[in-house]
């Protein structure tokens, strides 16, 4: 059934999900509608975003009565099937007021931030209309996403949302944007973000060294090997590994 559901078209999906939800109690359907604004659900998160004392019971009911949820390991988290989540989000945008949607995102942002989930917290902060707070939350996390986890698409998506002034106001974001450009061979873009970091005076040898590494990689990937070699030659011997 799930395979058939996954292969269904948009109209068929809407009909299938609508028919499925028609058999739910109204309270459960309303609960699912609000959960549709989340990427994954947890009983404590649901309790945080919904003013219902029985949120945990509704979570259990949703988990037990629908096959369209996938457990995320043994963490207590559940993930909605992408198609039903998309359907619920469309319904939410049509059924819930803008103020209620914003409040759900605001509560999700604050709860997720308290749990240390910077990326998801930032996504909800952005959806709630708090762009500056979202960018501040994600700034340091983006560097790790790029350099340690290789989630280049996620990094590129976040950077594309940020004004240049935000990126240049945060050193971690400048380095992240520089690496993102360098690893794709866009040496001009890499230079745009970190070029000034290799200009004297530069008291921080670690920062200077990493900026040189970014420029060396960007030029090397663009097959500007002579320029890359010059940046490599300038790398300070006392700079720590980045």
Stretches found by the model and what they are:
Residues 1-9:
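Amphipathic helix/helix-loop-helix segment enriched in hydrophobic residues with interspersed Lys/Arg
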Residues 14-94, 102-106:
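C-terminal boundary/linker of central alpha/beta nucleotide-binding cores
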Residues 23-24, 80, 147, 175, ...:
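Alpha-helical hairpin
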Residues 98-193:
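Extended alpha-helical scaffolding segments used for macromolecular assembly and cargo binding
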Residues 159-160, 164-242:
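Internal alpha-solenoid helical repeat scaffolds
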């Amino acid at each position: 059934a799930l395979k058939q559901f996954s292969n269904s078209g948009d109209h068929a999906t809407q009909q299938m999900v609508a028919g499925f939800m028609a058999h739910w109690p109204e309270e459960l359907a309303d609960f699912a509608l609000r959960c549709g604004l989340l990427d994954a659900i947890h009983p404590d998160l649901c309790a945080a975003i919904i003013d219902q004392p029985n949120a945990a019971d509704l979570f259990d009911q949703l988990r037990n009565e629908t096959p369209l949820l996938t457990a995320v390991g043994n963490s207590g988290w559940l993930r909605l099937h992408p198609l039903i989540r998309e359907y619920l989000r469309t319904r939410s945008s049509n059924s819930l007021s803008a103020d209620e949607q914003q409040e759900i995102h605001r509560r999700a942002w604050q709860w997720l931030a308290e749990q240390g989930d910077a990326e998801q917290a930032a996504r909800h902060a952005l959806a709630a209309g708090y762009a500056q707070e979202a960018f501040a939350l994600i700034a340091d996390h983006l560097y790790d996403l790029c350099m340690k986890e290789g989630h280049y698409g996620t990094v590129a998506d976040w950077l594309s949302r940020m004004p240049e002034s935000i990126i240049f106001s945060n050193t971690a974001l400048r380095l992240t944007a520089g690496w993102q450009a360098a690893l794709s061979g866009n040496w001009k873009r890499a230079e745009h973000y970190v070029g000034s970091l290799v200009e004297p005076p530069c008291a921080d040898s670690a920062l200077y060294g990493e900026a040189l590494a970014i420029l060396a990689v960007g030029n090397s990937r663009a097959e500007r090997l002579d320029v890359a070699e010059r940046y490599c030659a300038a790398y300070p011997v006392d700079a720590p590994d980045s």
